[in-house]
From Swiss-Prot:
It is an enzyme of class 3 (hydrolase). This is Guanosine-5'-triphosphate,3'-diphosphate pyrophosphatase. It catalyses: guanosine 3'-diphosphate 5'-triphosphate + H2O = guanosine 3',5'-bis(diphosphate) + phosphate + H(+). Pfam families: Ppx-GppA, Ppx-GppA_III. HAMAP family: GppA. GO terms for biological process: guanosine pentaphosphate catabolic process; guanosine tetraphosphate biosynthetic process; nucleobase-containing small molecule interconversion. CDD domains: ASKHA_NBD_EcGppA-like. The gene is gppA. It comes from Salmonella arizonae (strain ATCC BAA-731 / CDC346-86 / RSK2980). Catalyzes the conversion of pppGpp to ppGpp. Guanosine pentaphosphate (pppGpp) is a cytoplasmic signaling molecule which together with ppGpp controls the 'stringent response', an adaptive process that allows bacteria to respond to amino acid starvation, resulting in the coordinated regulation of numerous cellular activities.
């Protein structure tokens, strides 16, 4: 039974939106129970002399009354409420905070920009794959945080006075989406960035992740339009031109962009273009968490796992009682196959990791039923929370599991956008063969297999006499060869 002492809540009083996250701890990570988000646009109520309007404060209090109902079930020491840029700036913030504390029944802490940046980084470190040097970018309503670090440790923290709400009011107040508006917004953002750019470059990064609504909106747009999930400057410029073609903010229509995100999308886009340009960022992906996750993990005192994906796989294997010996057996065989074809197929390390992840989860569908197990596996993986994996990577894993046996659904492999379609096909072929040859569930019964690739042709060589001594195995291999031939994957068995 779930009791209130196992619940934790984090509330972020942002400049654009107020968010509440309620979680419980499960095996070293968090399980989300409630997420509530309301567009309050607090920053829009900030005057030139930093007075917060009565209307903006009332919008905020109204939202907090909703949050307060949920907080009644949670012990006060397990609740953290923080306020960010707008309430740092507002000269009458005390009035808002006093009433907010009365409504919520717990303290509200106005955190510094540097503390906000640190918490954002911790949220990313706990939920996003990869332990290498990273740059984290979070575009808020009134401030933008940029952080460099490795693993759990930050190396530089910056909070800059620019955000999607304040830039909307300054550079798109006429609601015109003209080239001139974008030029002015980008120039202003680059001016703000320039003093810290050298320090960020000095610390360096190998990967860049975005943790804001703007980046989330971009991810949704790219997935809706069938693009791969990497955000690049070319894609940002393409979206800017589309916005300019729409002419006015109220007429902004881009496939995948929700009405809720549309208002501050152009201003956030302009800031992001400036960041890409000024810091020469090659590409960015979406983070798995940010400020609220940082608050929660901080309350739980959980250390950052250096391999978040492995932790996720272990947790899911325990939860669904997956046979880990068999999962490792299939993964070992798939890794062996990869090694044999890597020169011909040039499969990148990230694709290799995704294939091995699919191997670890391939029997998850059996927890529902043997009948249609691949469909159950795909459904579960598509809808489970998988810290460390991006939405596109989850979709690829689900697609591989859907196609782990039986006739291949080629269109599904082409509809994912984590890797090119050809790579998805190659990963699928190797997964299917590894599952087939590990089917006896004993290491000593896995034959020595040589696999050669020439373009899309695979030649599979078995030990002399193996096919003659394994009639069921021969039947399964012949069936697999036939299924692969249906989608023009030549498989020669020797």
């Amino acid at each position: 039974m779930l009791n209130s002492t196992s619940l934790y809540a984090a509330i972020d009083l942002g400049s654009n939106s107020f968010h509440m996250l309620v979680v419980r701890e499960v095996a070293g990570s968090i399980q989300t129970l409630t997420r509530i988000k309301r567009k309050v646009r607090l920053a829009a109520g900030l005057s030139s002399d930093n007075q917060l309007s009565a209307e903006a404060m009332e919008r905020g209090w109204q939202c907090l009354r909703l949050f307060a109902e949920r907080l009644q079930d949670i012990p006060q020491p397990q609740i953290r409420v923080v306020a960010t840029a707008t309430l740092r700036l507002a000269v009458n913030a005390g009035e808002f905070i006093a009433k907010a504390q009365t409504i919520l029944g717990c303290p509200v802490q106005v955190i510094s920009g540097e503390e906000e940046a640190r918490l954002i980084y911790q949220g990313v470190a706990h939920t996003t794959g990869g332990a290498e040097q990273r740059l984290v970018v979070d575009i808020g309503g009134a401030s933008t945080e940029l952080v460099t670090g490795t693993g759990a440790q930050t190396t530089s923290l910056f909070s800059l006075s620019m955000g999607c709400v304040t830039w909307l009011e300054h550079y798109f107040s006429d609601r015109n989406l003209a080239q001139e508006n974008f030029d002015d917004a980008e120039k202003a953002a680059r001016d703000v960035l320039r003093p810290v750019a050298d320090k960020l470059r000095f610390h360096g990064w190998k990967v860049c992740v975005g943790a804001s609504g703007t980046v989330q909106a971009l991810q949704e747009i790219m997935m809706a339009q069938g693009m791969d999930e990497r955000i690049t400057l070319a894609k940002l410029q393409q979206l800017k031109q589309r916005a300019i073609q729409c002419g006015r903010l109220e007429e902004l229509e881009i496939e995948g962009l929700t009405l809720e995100r549309a208002l501050v999308f152009p201003s956030g886009l302009a800031i992001l273009i400036a960041i890409f340009t000024e810091l020469n960022i090659q590409f960015m992906t979406l983070a798995g968490g940010a400020l609220r996750e940082g608050l929660v993990y901080g309350m739980l005192h959980l250390t950052v796992d250096q391999d978040i994906c492995s932790r996720t796989l272990r947790n899911i294997q325990r939860r669904f009682i997956i046979d880990t010996d068999q999962a490792n057996r299939v993964a070992k065989l798939a890794g062996n196959f990869l090694k044999q074809v890597e020169n011909a197929w040039h499969i990148e390390p990230i694709s290799r990791e995704l294939l091995l992840s699919a191997c670890q989860l391939h029997e998850i569908g059996l927890s529902v039923d043997f009948k249609q197990a691949p469909y159950h596996a795909a459904y579960l993986v598509r809808h489970l929370d998988l810290p460390g994996y991006t939405p596109a990577q989850k979709k690829l894993l689900a697609t591989l599991l859907l196609n782990q046996t039986n006739p291949v659904d080629l269109s599904s492999l082409h509809q994912q956008n984590a890797v090119p379609p050809r790579v998805a096909e190659q990963l699928c072929r190797l997964l299917r063969l590894a599952i087939l040859f590990a089917g006896r569930r004993r290491d000593d019964l896995v034959p020595e297999i040589t696999l050669q690739a020439q373009n899309e042709n695979l030649t599979l060589t078995l030990p002399d006499g193996w096919l003659a001594h394994h009639p069921l195995g021969k039947e399964l291999i012949d069936q697999e060869s036939q299924w692969q031939s249906y989608v023009h994957w030549p498989l020669d068995i020797r």
